């Protein structure tokens, strides 16, 4: 199996769009609706992202079926759970996600630089990916992600520290909410 970063790049050549398969929790038949989305939209996508609140409503067999169907259509599967616990919990959670067919997991780097780096290294050994959150789209997230911190004589905002950790930790991608175009621009310049 090839690396996640190579697989997503290959899929993105056809289309750079990742479907955020985010349904209202009250919507019934999530599995069948998700399978229908994959079958109808796969030619326009490179991947599908499933949020935590939807995963909680599906059993292991349903999740595996969704991921297999996505793979059969050439799509990458991303678990958007913003994983951010102690290292052992992160590793066990990631292993369970991999066993259900996910290709990558979205994490919140609040877990710490070392835990993030270790999760990336272990995931990469299994050809899986880690996508790290830098800043959330929710308006109230500004209060935390833009906190000014001082770290070894360097003042910066928390999202900038998270970006530094993502780069040095060799994550496969970062996430910045679309509601913050200046921060997207900052992150893009920092990566290139």
What are these regions (language model features)?
Residues 3, 57, 86, 182, ...:
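Charge-biased, low-complexity intrinsically disordered regions
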Residues 13, 23-26, 87-181, 190:
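Conserved anion-binding
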Residues 19, 49-50, 77-81, 106-107, ...:
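General beta-strand structural signal in soluble alpha/beta enzymes
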Residues 53-56, 82-90:
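Conserved PLP phosphate-binding loop immediately N-terminal to the Schiff-base lysine helix
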Residues 1-77, 154-159, 165-172:
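Conserved N-terminal beta1-alpha1 strand-loop-helix module at the mouth
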Residues 70-82, 127-130, 189-192:
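Short beta-strand/loop segments at the ligand-binding rim of alpha/beta enzyme cores
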């Amino acid at each position: 199996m090839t690396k996640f970063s190579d697989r997503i790049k290959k899929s993105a050549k056809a289309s750079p769009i990742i479907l955020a398969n985010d349904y209202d929790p009250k919507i019934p038949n999530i599995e069948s609706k998700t399978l229908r989305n994959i079958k109808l939209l796969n030619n326009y996508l490179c991947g599908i992202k499933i949020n935590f609140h939807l995963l909680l409503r599906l059993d292991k067999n349903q999740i595996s079926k969704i991921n297999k169907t996505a793979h059969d259509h050439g799509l990458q599967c991303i678990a958007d759970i913003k994983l951010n616990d102690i290292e052992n919990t992160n590793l066990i959670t990631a292993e369970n996600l991999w066993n259900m067919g996910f290709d990558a997991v979205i994490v919140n780097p609040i877990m710490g630089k070392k835990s993030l780096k270790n999760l990336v290294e272990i995931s990469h050994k299994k050809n899986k990916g880690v996508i790290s959150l830098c800043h959330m789209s929710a308006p109230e997230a500004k209060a935390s992600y833009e906190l000014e911190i001082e770290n070894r004589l360097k003042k910066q905002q928390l999202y900038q520290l998270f970006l530094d950790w993502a780069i040095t930790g060799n994550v496969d991608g970062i996430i910045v909410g679309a509601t913050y175009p200046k921060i997207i621009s900052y992150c893009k310049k920092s990566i290139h």
